[in-house]
Swiss-Prot record:
The keyword Magnesium does not apply. It comes from the Bacteria. Binds together with bS18 to 16S ribosomal RNA. Belongs to the bacterial ribosomal protein bS6 family. GO terms for cellular component: cytosolic small ribosomal subunit. This is Small ribosomal subunit protein bS6. NCBIfam families: S6. Gene3D superfamilies: 3.30.70.60. One of its GO terms (molecular function) is small ribosomal subunit rRNA binding. Residues 93-151 have a biased composition (Basic and acidic residues). Residues 93-159 are annotated as: Disordered. It comes from Rhodopseudomonas palustris (strain HaA2). Keywords: Ribonucleoprotein, Ribosomal protein, RNA-binding, rRNA-binding. InterPro entries: Ribosomal_bS6 (IPR000529), Ribosomal_bS6_sf (IPR035980), Ribosomal_S6_plastid/chlpt (IPR020814), Transl_elong_EF1B/ribsomal_bS6 (IPR014717).
Amino acid sequence: MPLYEHVFLARQDASTQQVEELTTQITGVIEGLGGKVTKTEAWGLRSLTYRMNKNRKAHFVLLNIDGPSAVVSEIERQERINEDIVRYLTVRVDEHEEGPSAMMRKADRDRERDDRGPREGGFRGDREGRGDREGGGFRGDRGPRRPREDADTAAASEE
């Protein structure tokens, strides 16, 4: 049977429990028509690149499906009817990816970075202070400003 990756986006105001119920409902439709879901990943509430149906965020869910094309037509029909689903996309693939998807690997990598703690120094490296702030950076205090010589000559030429 053909293999599919199916991603759907649920509304931002839907709770996590409602999203899980949607997922089990879709899984039930797939299994009822002779297909099977090999993997389910909930990517959580994520920001959208642009607004869709007045939503700035959405719950993302990935389903790896092994089933006939009738399964895909039926779940897409069900999702068109359902108001909680903002968007969906089904792609036929040659084989399913083993292990976590790229989105889950990215989330794991971000979590590992958070464990490192706050970074010291930022992008300026070890350049202590800044020149336009108190302390003057490496230059230190420059002392009082010395008078300009050309200021005296400019005033004399105007007279």
